Regions:
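Short, contiguous strand/loop micro-motifs
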Residues: 1, 59-60, 86, 117, ...
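Class I S-adenosyl-L-methionine
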Residues: 35-85, 89-108
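Mixed-charge interfacial surface used for oligomerization/domain docking
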Residues: 3, 9-23, 28-30, 34-35, ...
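Local beta-strand N-terminus motif with an aromatic residue
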Residues: 1-2, 80
Length: 285
């Protein structure tokens, strides 16, 4: 059997993980009072954002312990199963390296690793693709190879209400954050070579949607042969214009809609929304 493993930065919550047949190792979030919660397990995203709104100090995030990975690998090996692990970009977290180190510590060779070079919605799309390929009967080697190909055509574009969260979390240079936050500008970000990068700026919320749609087209458009994934932090209303754009303007299927989880929400901040998609250049045999 092939087991699909990911981390909670993919924002696949337990109920959906069970439905997809994938396993999720949670990252950790340390709250202002020192309480450590497991991402996607101990608090719902909505509960977390409510707590975050009252924080004077930004919560911190940390990778899982190697022991969690070791235990999973050992159980899979004992059952004779192979593992395909898909993790958030190594440029943004030590989780990928931690997952690989754990395989060495567990002395197993049944794990194939995929650095998504993405995060959140983008990482989640790769995990869903992996589950689909497994259900089609592909081998672990075939799944990993297809994901390596697919991630070259994977994009995440998001509008951020305030870049201060990314700056405080160390995911964006201070000078870029200041420039993006000037004069009521709504900055757009993307993931480029595994890192957070500025993708544009717009004035006000309507302008942010227009800029986001323009960037999507610049990146190759939304491939109708694969699902897309829209994400929000506070309210589903944040993604309504994205749904309208895809369905009414482009004639595409509605995107999947998911709430952005605690780890990524810590850095993106309240009011963030975006879309992950595969571009029209992706072809999978």
């Amino acid at each position: 059997m092939i087991r699909i493993l990911t981390d909670s930065a993919s924002d696949i919550l337990p109920a959906e993980a069970s439905q997809l047949g994938v396993d999720v190792i949670p990252l950790n979030v340390t709250l202002e009072d020192g309480t450590v919660i497991r991402d996607g397990v101990d608090l719902t995203p909505s509960e977390y954002y409510e707590h975050m709104a009252g924080c004077k100090k930004l919560p911190t995030t940390s990778q899982p312990s190697p022991e969690l990975f070791e235990k999973f690998y050992a159980e899979a090996a004992a059952a004779g199963d192979e593992v395909v692990g898909i993790f958030l970009s190594h440029e943004l977290s030590g989780t990928y390296q931690c997952a690989k180190l754990a395989a060495d510590l567990a002395n197993v060779d049944n794990v194939l690793f995929v650095d998504s070079t993405n995060v959140c919605l983008g990482e989640g799309l790769l995990v869903r693709l992996a589950a689909h390929l497994r259900d089609e009967g592909k081998s672990a080697v075939q799944i990993a190879a297809t994901l390596e190909h697919a991630k070259e055509h994977l994009h995440l574009v998001a509008a951020i209400d305030d870049l201060k969260y990314l700056r405080k979390g160390g995911r964006l240079p201070a000078a870029v954050a200041v420039a993006g936050g000037m004069l009521g500008i709504k900055p757009l970000i993307t993931i480029k070579e595994g890192k957070v990068a500025m993708a544009g700026k717009a004035r006000g919320l309507p302008g942010a949607y227009v800029a986001l749609f323009k960037k999507i087209e610049e990146l190759g458009g939304v491939n109708p042969r694969f699902p897309s994934l829209a994400g929000y932090t506070i309210s589903t209303r944040e993604v309504n214009p994205i749904q309208t754009y895809l369905v009414d303007n482009l004639g595409l299927s509605e995107p999947l809609v998911r709430q952005i989880g605690c780890v990524i929400g810590t850095h993106a901040g309240p009011g963030a929304f975006g879309l992950a998609f595969f571009d029209n250049g992706l072809v999978i045999d």
